[in-house]
């Protein structure tokens, strides 16, 4: 019974992240929604790992790797956003067409 609740929560988080990623106009908000999507995938990995084989930690270890990749993605993404803000004075996605210049 607990697995269903966690999976439903994960689907809700994934849906909120996708909706936010599609409708977001701000780069920082888009990065936050992308991290929300990755965290919902981590919840699924840990839940299915515990559901199918509770003695092995394959899903948990893979989840740690996904968290490390998400941290690197956030650091690089925020560095790019701060660089764009320094040059363009805006973090809006529709105002930062870098191919024009």
Swiss-Prot record:
Entry keyword Acyltransferase: no
Protein EC: 7.1.1.-
User: Which InterPro entries does this one have?
Assistant: NADH_UbQ_OxRdtase_chain4L/K (IPR001133), NUOK/Mnh_C1-like (IPR039428)
Q: Name one GO cellular component term.
A: chloroplast thylakoid membrane
Which GO terms fall under molecular function for this chain's record? oxidoreductase activity, acting on NAD(P)H, quinone or similar compound as acceptor; quinone binding
Pfam (any one): Oxidored_q2
Transmembrane spans:
2-22, 61-81
Catalysed reactions listed for this entry: a plastoquinone + NADH + (n+1) H(+)(in) = a plastoquinol + NAD(+) + n H(+)(out); a plastoquinone + NADPH + (n+1) H(+)(in) = a plastoquinol + NADP(+) + n H(+)(out)
Which UniProt keywords are listed? Chloroplast, Membrane, NAD, NADP, Plastid, Plastoquinone, Quinone, Thylakoid, Translocase, Transmembrane, Transmembrane helix, Transport
User: Disulfide connectivity?
Assistant: none
Q: What does this protein do?
A: NDH shuttles electrons from NAD(P)H:plastoquinone, via FMN and iron-sulfur (Fe-S) centers, to quinones in the photosynthetic chain and possibly in a chloroplast respiratory chain. The immediate electron acceptor for the enzyme in this species is believed to be plastoquinone. Couples the redox reaction to proton translocation, and thus conserves the redox energy in a proton gradient.
Supply the HAMAP family for this chain.
NDH1_NuoK (MF_01456)
Instruction: Please give the family membership noted in the entry.
Output: Belongs to the complex I subunit 4L family.
What is annotated about its quaternary structure and interactions?
Answer: NDH is composed of at least 16 different subunits, 5 of which are encoded in the nucleus.
Please state what the protein is called.
Answer: NAD(P)H-quinone oxidoreductase subunit 4L, chloroplastic
Gene source species? Dioscorea elephantipes
By which gene is this protein encoded?
Answer: ndhE
